[in-house]
Amino acid sequence: MNYDVIVVGGGHAGIEASLASARMGKKTLLITMLVEQIGAASCNPAIGGLAKGHLVRELDAIGGEMGLCTDNTGIQFRILNASKGAAVQGSRAQIDMDKYREYMRKVCHNTPNLEVYQDEVTALLVKNDNEVCGVKTKLTEEFIAKKVVLTTGTFMRGLVHIGENKYEAGRAWELPSTTLSTQLKELGLRVGRLKTGTPSRLDANSIDFSVMDMHGGDVNPAPFSFRTNKSDFAPTQFPCYITYTNEKTHEIISSNFYRAPLFTGQIEGLGPRYCPSIEDKVNRFAERDRHQLFLEPQTAMCTEYYINGMSSSLPIDVQKAMIHSVKGLENAKIIRYGYAIEYDYVDPTELKHTLETKKIKNLYHAGQINATTGYEEAAAQGLIAGINACLSIDEKEPFILRRDEAYIGVLIDDLVTKGTNEPYRMFTSRAEYRLLLREENADLRLSQYGHKFGLIDDETIKKVENKRKTIEEAIEFMANEWMTSKKETLELLESIGEEKINDRVLLVDLIGRNSIDIFKFEKLVPSFAHLDNYLKEQIIIEAKYYRYIQKQQKQIEKMKKMLKATIPESFSYKGLPGLSNEVVEKLEKHRPPTIFNASLISGVTPAALDIIHLNLNIFVTNTKK
């Protein structure tokens, strides 16, 4: 059978890659080990979070499915960091894991141009030593394709650890992929080993919730997808519960360090720095007398709870003892024990910004195979890989998001230029231009791309453009409207509880005060009071960041100009202060014609580009003399 695109793996990356490909009109085949597990949430029953919510909003703006699925299957919605600025707030939703999986499976089955097939891909078909042309499966079938996208998750040589016990698996009790990473290594790709883990799941009927703190959703929940009707969005919300470990818990754990695979050398791969196991936390933060735990329902039935904050690969007797030492969990019945899993990944610096491998043509990687952690990071990569595979077939320009355009751009740029030796997680602090890259404006930033690729329909893009026009009109009006200290103005400010002004002030700066809310906005800018509250909130946010955004836009224009700078053949990188030997070696080898081309070389950081640009200007000036 012949296909345009074959996607290997039905996780969060594989779903977005295959849907994007099919929706762009390409004959697509999604091959996965278990069709029932398409869209499975292998670890926590939640989507989003700090910076992760940005990724979901961005992939939704381009035409991805994760946001819509979350809105349809979520059982609790919250805005994290709600008391802080909009740039660092993050949307998060608890999901019904079963319904999420069912939704994604149904979408995949009902999408034109997309076929779903259950099997294990055992090998890539390669011609001319460096060109993928299809895959071979365990049932000995061969499928020919123009492009192949690998989204293998934790399945490549997956090895589960629970105490001294270990067994081969891609996920608990699911078969691993045993041959694929060996072939990738033989093809010259650098393959490494990483580790992640998950906590035990508990029977709800055995938990004493009455002694825990209830943690509910927002009163007025906001959907993830820009395409979800906000006025009709009223999901049934279920609470989570908070409890804590204690000194007894820590004593049980620390006295069994000698049995922990993490410390005995049984586990070789590095785990996620920002999501450590409970034994790692107790070891690293010995001075802490407790750690917070969240009990999260896995489905709307609330029969099984996930212990967020207690990931572990300790032996089952130790897991049982430590869980029973926690307040409210004294009689908890364990349905599934926590475990760690090691798996193979491919060094992401082996990739282009399109997520195609540099050494092997037509082969794309997305998700945990690229050393990332998290459903959202995986889904974002899957979307980009799927889009670029299609664009390459059509011989069109690749889709590469800049760091100033999207968190997705930051994610991919970090991976392919800097690389990582531990599971990579997205944070707002990784984005230099985070004031521009807010959740609520993702559609304004990115929907035009989705429409261009046929992933966003005409009606949606029309709404986005109308929204853009309204916001721009409001900001332009406020940026040119002066408020003076006349009697009427002072009385108005006093009536809404705002500090008086002593001199004239631009309305945009007045609205930019932290104390301004929708009510005050309507009083100060009555000509825009008729807009819906979501739009008014966005105008207020734009006003708050107005001055900062102006500064960042100037920085971006400066950066764009810098990237266009040409580099003469006679320019030498040797001896430039601040550049590592590795970077100098790569630059001398590749001889990039422009600074933009230099930025695409792995290991060449933004700081290195600044050094090159500075010395390039000196070189050009001296050459002219």
From Swiss-Prot:
Coiled coil: none annotated. InterPro entries: FAD/NAD-bd_sf (IPR036188), GIDA_C_N (IPR049312), MnmG (IPR004416), MnmG-rel (IPR002218), MnmG-rel_CS (IPR020595), MnmG_C (IPR026904), MnmG_C_subdom (IPR047001), MnmG_C_subdom_sf (IPR044920). NCBIfam families: mnmG_gidA. GO terms for cellular component: cytosol. Its main location: cytoplasm. Belongs to the MnmG family. It comes from the Bacteria. The keyword Lipoprotein does not apply. FAD binds at residues 9-14, 121, 177, 368. Signal peptide: none annotated. It is found in: Cytoplasm. One of its GO terms (molecular function) is flavin adenine dinucleotide binding. Keywords: Cytoplasm, FAD, Flavoprotein, NAD, tRNA processing. Homodimer. Heterotetramer of two MnmE and two MnmG subunits. Its cofactor is FAD. This is tRNA uridine 5-carboxymethylaminomethyl modification enzyme MnmG. SUPFAM superfamilies: FAD/NAD(P)-binding domain. GO terms for biological process: tRNA methylation; tRNA wobble uridine modification. NAD-binding protein involved in the addition of a carboxymethylaminomethyl (cmnm) group at the wobble position (U34) of certain tRNAs, forming tRNA-cmnm(5)s(2)U34. NAD(+) binds at residues 271-285. The gene is mnmG.
